[in-house]
Amino acid sequence: MGKASEMTKQSIADCFIELVVAQPDPRRRIDVTTLVKKIEIDRKTFYNHFDNTTDLVIWIFRARLAEKLRDRKFYQAELDYPAEELHDKYTDLPCYARFYGRREGELNQGPFFRTVCGVLNEQSEYYRRIFGFACYIDFLRYVELLFIPLFKTDIQIMLGKGRKLSASTHEFLAEYHATGLWGRVRLYFSYLNQSIPDQDLDPVWNYAHTAIRLTLDAMFEGPEGNATFHAQLAQKRCGRPL
């Protein structure tokens, strides 16, 4: 895609963000007709760049995040991309950065999560509406599904060579922490109606991965601890109190 085409794509995105934020009723969808009229392009030009407004919402998030991840401060990180099974359109855009610690299996993901929240805070009113009203896309579910496979890879790294989990336990831990993280993000935007206080959260940006590591360590302390953990997990799945 040429420079002029990229500029058109970004102009469409900027105009869409402006219209979403200015919409008096956030439950009402900004359609393609309104968008192309505002930016003074034809519908064909829009569809040359995006499939629909759902695709546009996804690209806005992914393109800005990828731009941040390609910054020099991430040169030591391992960039990762959407899992193949998601059939994501933007497989060329990195969506994750993995920072390895000094110890084997240690991950320090704080810089990445702070960067993600910075991307959201840049357009806080836009993302408040995108998270809060599913008239374009269930954005919360999109980012959850994007991150669950990435967390599964993280867990595999943290397990190392000598420890193994059942497939269901591995999946459970990845889902639990990925959905928990994004649920908290949505809480700020949709219910607390505020941006994420990134500076105040400096001590806990790596909290999800710290919790995963502590959970894994507790599970593998010994046969008794491992059996207890799996029994509690089974009870939780069955809906019985722990």
Residue map of PLM features:
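Amphipathic alpha-helical linker/stalk segments
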Residues: 18-22, 61-108, 127-131
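Alpha-helical structural segments
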Residues: 11-18, 38, 55-78, 111, ...
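Amphipathic alpha-helical packing segments from all-alpha helical-bundle domains
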Residues: 112-122, 134-161, 171-183
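Short, amphipathic alpha-helix enriched in basic
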Residues: 6-32, 62
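Secondary-structure edge/capping motif, primarily at the C-terminal ends of alpha-helices
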Residues: 23, 79, 124-131, 158-161, ...
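C-terminal peripheral helix-coil segments that are non-catalytic and often amphipathic
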Residues: 156, 178-242
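Helix-turn-helix
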Residues: 23-59
